[in-house]
Amino acid sequence: MNSTMLRVTNRIIERSRDTRAAYLARINQAKTDTVHRAQLACGNLAHGFAACQADDKASLKSMLRNNIAIITSYNDMLSAHQPYEHYPEIIRKALHSANAVGQVAGGVPAMCDGVTQGQDGMELSLLSREVIAMSAAIGLSHNMFDGALYLGVCDKIVPGLTMAALSFGHLPSVFIPSGPMASGLPNKEKVRIRQLYAEGKVDRMALLESEAASYHAPGTCTFYGTANTNQMVVEFMGMQLPGSSFVHPDAPLREALTAAAARKVTRMTGNGNEWMPLGKMFDEKVVVNGIVALLATGGSTNHTMHLVAMARAAGIIINWDDFSDLSDVVPLLARLYPNGPADINHFQAAGGVPVLVRELLKGGLLNEDVHTVAGFGLSRYTLEPWLNNGELDWREGATAPLDDQVIATFEKPFSRHGGTKVLSGNLGRAVMKTSAVPVENQVIEAPAVVFESQHDVLPAFEAGLLDKDCVVVVRHQGPKANGMPELHKLMPPLGVLLDRRFKIALVTDGRLSGASGKVPSAIHVTPEAYDGGLLAKVRDGDLIRVNGQTGELTLLVDEAELAARQPHIPDLSASRVGTGREMFGALREKLSGAEQGATCITF
């Protein structure tokens, strides 16, 4: 085991000692010696199975067979969630074969950040994670269930479902992905057309045709954003079946994996032979494995918040120091767009999760001694699923990367350090996705150009006001200010400026997600401008140093002058109403800082 891995893991265990013990005591208290519905009064139980078919009613009356909750995030607008339409029937059939019953316990909302980018609805995106967690909890609160299956893929859905699943941590749980769409227009070409559009060189129809050729079918988007990072991290944490993350939605193997997940959860229940509740399985070592997966693949920066919130739901306390220390020793072993030209399908073809797990285990950079839904030991995740005469089976995955331009070996990584860097200085703490930023662009010291909204940046770009070396500051985009939207509209114009050979960086208390590209971006700045952060005192022309190599984020202004300045707090009333935002004010006010998970749920 790598010494830093061991030190960070032990530090988290010690830091979480009291909160983890309290959590485990709570889920132990919730565990019963019989099926959970046995605690219900007859009237309660009759309501619970009133709509079931006769055989299922008889099974539920008997108090002998498991009843498995299905929590689904199906809707047919999200390409990644459209395949879930028919999963409940696949699951019920598999459960019947295992002498169990399945009920859809509830549905949760699932919004698409791709649809809401640059729109008012994006200000509800991060808040939707909390709503998803609470919605799933309501579905599970009926106390009818002995285990749960979670159908979710995209950005806030998997973290929200995980938070809910851990609140019901006495139940065994398995997560079921839907898989990626087939590859479409290459990501590099898509970005080229976006930048041409930003420069006014192609029209809107050309842009729309490009986007439609990229996002064109059921399944997750193929770039390595938050959705695919979710799947990577959750598989490394042992919460879904080995090799299940990146199988296409319409592949026969996908249906076989879905059915297998249903059968597996029945064996993990109290009256199965592999009892393993999620709350026990999801421990400090599992959390560290999730962080390693994020760093080794250059995954979405959103997970510097999501993993914090997910861990806290299990009584585990992590912070950005843990990410930073691990990033110093975890090498970058995957090159996926925006960190390289390959997409998630190329990653799967290059050996996928099994070969990546194998390489990291070889380097002593994963905790192998963990419980997973596949059994004890993370080495089980070096296996890959396949159909053996039509039946699901597992075999050893690739023993080395099949494409060294997509997956590297531990001995010859793409970088000796992980894909995420924590920055610190008088402006606060922030994160940078360094895996997508060329080394020569990771250090900049330049005057600030300050904006209060991403919508003001494009007019300034078009007017030529940014044709210079500068640090673009977009503030009052943090959790409490306006829900911490993602600011992807900034990337095309800032990318153009980089191509024009200007030294450019972005500093913001907002988010950029997994699509953070070649622009060096210090994001998630905390404390946020709206909540006392120094970012609120930055003025046009102030020198800012952003160093993605040493981890520095410094406002180079005399301390006495800064002390004399008043923070600038703009009128944010426009972000308080419309598109349903008026209903989320109470949640927004309670959100914690980015490093604390940007959550309003107190565990």
Please place each PLM-identified region on the residue numbering:
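N-terminal small/polar loop signature for handling phosphorylated ligands or for N-terminal nucleophile
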Residues: 105-143
